[in-house]
Curated annotation (Swiss-Prot):
The reaction(s) this protein catalyses: D-sedoheptulose 7-phosphate + D-glyceraldehyde 3-phosphate = aldehydo-D-ribose 5-phosphate + D-xylulose 5-phosphate
Residue numbers binding Mg(2+): D157, N187, I189
Keyword terms of this UniProt record: Calcium, Magnesium, Metal-binding, Thiamine pyrophosphate, Transferase
A GO CC term assigned to this protein in UniProt: nucleus
Coiled-coil features, chain-numbered ranges: none
The name this protein goes by in its record: Transketolase
Organism name: Kluyveromyces lactis (strain ATCC 8585 / CBS 2359 / DSM 70799 / NBRC 1267 / NRRL Y-1140 / WM37) (Yeast)
Gene this protein is translated from: TKL1
Length: 679
């Protein structure tokens, strides 16, 4: 006998028709997947632990719609389950300024992550599952289980075809993340037509090879009991589970099973027959029977609110039993760092020895790692090069492997840069003040640009430790030497891109990156040693740009970043011998500098002083700050780092020569600062 009633089936039909009505009202959107996935959504959400009155409750279950184009389904669920999503909001689907944008966006209560670029959501979900396992292993005690939530995911064929999902799913299998349950919408349709035009692999065997539990629901269109049974079985597994859910895209539509129902509104006659088929009045839209509201209120909302109350009481008891850990949990849930943590940050003087900035980064991480338990680090198989693993760190690994445990805070991502980026977004989205950081070579952050862009769009404050930041890496040559990379990432809104020149600037980069709650950061670091510079300080560098060394009435300003700043300082000495006075400006982060007042920016780059930028990467983007740019608008070369710098004339004399030409060119001309603009 089925555990589901006619009211459950009415609820499924309600979900379907709310999604269809949204798409029809907007005359835009994707009705096909919501029609096919509504039964699974009903089964999952009905048993989820959630509290719509406290959507950020840390021990809630999480739902990720990786196939974000099906967002009309998610918005319907948010309305039905009591979140801040009204029928009027649904009627404004895809309208400018609405709560119902064309793909789910992170800031909306109940939306766990921004999805749309396929494959990102399932990868974010892996990150959430990692964070939950780590939080549980760190704080759970006998009789005090603070964390035992699940992460559920919907994904489609498109997600599975994107490489990022393979990277993340492979790692999830290795890590045996049993709190992760994914539903694969096996509807056999893509935008181009039947899936067989491009995709005929055995997804089940693929995920079995990853180390996942794989189950199959043959009739995902209306077999609620089979879906529920698969879900119960998944919860018994000691591994992540993929439930292959065979559905019909556009179920109930006249065009069901066709690619035409994927991304276009149903025609009016189709909508009417669909409503008749599901027992609704064909002349009415956005209808929710009271029985459906009552069903979800009784099955999910009221129990969720009560579970949250019980959890709050459990936390209070936990604080009494484990005062130190309890205070730490409360601090993290409040999104705060420990008082005085900044005292752990190192500072430097010019008398200190020259050190590679990747090593300076390691020193910062070593100093703060024990103080900040929310740091969850890792590297894409470059730990010895990135220097990202702190002394005494334990690896995040399944205990069964003997390689670490789930309380470990260092993740071996393998050669999976894109997966790492998307997983870090999920770790951040989990909450509890998690601050993930991941290491790779700067050039290979480009592999993960899709995830980096979503970090910035969503405001996930993840940190990329991006070493080997220039031709200075030497012998590995142009395949590994970044050229366009910084210009690309600097163009992304809400993204810090640091290229520190010495120890104080490395410290400043981490200080700003860690204290900023809504902006991710890439910290580009050198392989070669860099001197500690006269005039640098953490206090100046946190502004993103500052005058490192100044002169009275400068003939020009040389602005630079990273390893070239020290060379620019030497170039100024060459120029001084020719009676040319150069102001030296260090600009480690365009974004942070852009946050300063216009008055401050113009004090660094005033009218009347020609500006030459020097950076051994592409010159694109430098016109914002400089009149002339000396950079590398070609690929690098293989050889010893100093020899490669010499080849491309990034030497004191090479910079001085271009500085002289800049001074000569602007002599007698009115020089307006590039920052002195109309708006």
């Amino acid at each position: 006998m089925s555990q589901y009633t006619d009211i459950d089936r009415l609820a499924v039909s309600t979900i379907r028709l709310l999604a269809v009505d949204q798409v029809s009202a907007a005359n835009s959107g994707h009705p096909g997947a919501p029609l096919g996935l509504a039964p699974a959504a009903h089964v999952i959400w009905k048993q989820m632990r959630l509290n719509p009155k406290n959507p950020e409750w840390i021990n809630r279950d999480r739902f990720v719609l990786s196939n974000g184009h099906a967002c009309a389904l998610l918005y319907s669920l948010l309305h039905l389950f009591g979140y801040d999503m009204s029928i009027e909001d649904l009627k404004h689907f895809r309208h400018l300024g609405s709560k119902t944008p064309g793909h789910p966006e992170f800031e909306l209560p109940g939306v766990e992550v921004t999805t749309g670029p396929l494959g990102q959501g399932i990868s974010n979900a892996v990150g959430m599952a990692i964070a939950q396992a780590n939080f549980a292993a760190t704080y759970n005690k006998p009789d005090y289980e603070l964390s035992d939530s699940y992460t559920y995911v919907f994904l489609g064929d498109g997600c599975l075809q994107e490489g990022v999902s393979s990277e993340a799913s492979s790692l999830a299998g290795h890590l045996r993340l049993k709190n992760l349950i994914a539903f694969y919408d096996d509807n056999q349709i893509t935008i181009d037509g039947n899936i067989n035009v491009s995709f005929d692999e055995d997804v089940s065997k693929r995920y079995e090879a990853y180390g996942w539990e794989v189950l199959h629901v043959e009739n995902g269109n209306d077999d609620l009991d089979a879906i529920s049974k698969a879900l119960e079985q998944a919860k018994l597994s000691d591994r992540p589970t993929l439930i292959k859910l065979t559905t019909t895209i556009g179920f109930g539509s006249l065009n069901a099973g066709s690619h035409s129902v994927h991304g276009a509104p149903l025609k009016a006659d189709d909508v009417k027959q669909l409503k008749v088929k599901f027992g609704f009045n064909p002349e009415e839209s956005f209808v929710v029977p009271q029985e459906v509201y009552d069903l979800y209120n009784k099955s999910t909302i009221e129990p969720g609110i009560e579970a949250n109350k019980q959890w709050d009481a459990l936390l209070d008891a936990y604080v009494g039993q484990f005062p130190e850990l309890g205070a730490e949990v409360k601090r993290r849930l409040a999104g705060e760092f420990p008082e005085g943590w900044e005292s752990k940050l190192p500072t430097y003087t010019p008398e200190d020895s020259a050190v590679a900035s990747r090593k300076l980064s390691e020193i910062v991480l070593d100093n703060v790692f024990d103080t900040l338990p929310e740091l969850l680090g890792g590297s894409a198989d470059l730990t010895p090069s990135n220097l990202t693993r702190s002394k005494g760190a334990v690896d995040f690994q399944p205990p069964i492997t003997g390689l670490g445990d789930y309380s470990g805070r260092y993740i071996r991502y393998g050669v999976r840069e894109h997966g790492m980026g998307a997983i870090m977004n999920g770790i951040s989205a989990f909450g509890a003040n998690y601050r993930p950081y991941g290491g790779t070579f700067l050039n290979f952050v480009s592999y993960a640009s899709g995830a980096v862009r979503l970090s910035a769009l969503s405001g996930h404050p993840v940190i990329w430790v991006a070493t080997h930041d220039s031709i200075g890496l030497g012998e590995d040559g142009p395949t590994h030497q970044p050229i366009e990379t910084l210009a690309h990432f600097r163009a992304i809104p809400n993204l810090q891109v640091w290229r520190p020149a010495d120890g104080n600037e490395v410290t400043a980069a981490y200080k700003v990156a860690l204290t900023n709650k809504h902006t991710p950061a890439i910290i580009a670091l050198s392989r070669q040693n860099l001197p500690q510079l006269q005039g640098s300080s953490v206090e100046k560098a946190v502004k993103g740009g500052y005058i490192l060394q100044d002169v009275d009435q400068p003939d020009l300003a040389i602005v630079s970043t990273g390893s070239e700043v020290g060379i620019a300082v030497e170039a100024a000495k060459v120029l001084a011998e020719k009676n040319i006075k150069a102001r030296i400006v260090s600009l480690p982060d365009f974004h942070s500098f852009g946050q300063q007042s216009k008055e401050y920016q113009l004090s660094v780059f005033p009218d009347g002083v020609p500006i030459l930028s020097v950076e051994v990467l592409a010159t694109s983007g430098w016109s914002k700050y400089a009149h002339q740019s000396f950079g590398l608008d070609r690929f690098g070369a293989s050889g010893k780092g100093p020899a490669v710098y010499e080849k491309f004339e990034f030497t004191p004399q090479g910079i001085a020569t271009r500085a002289e030409k800049t001074v000569e060119f602007y002599k007698g001309k009115q020089v307006i600062s590039p920052l002195n603009t109309a708006f």
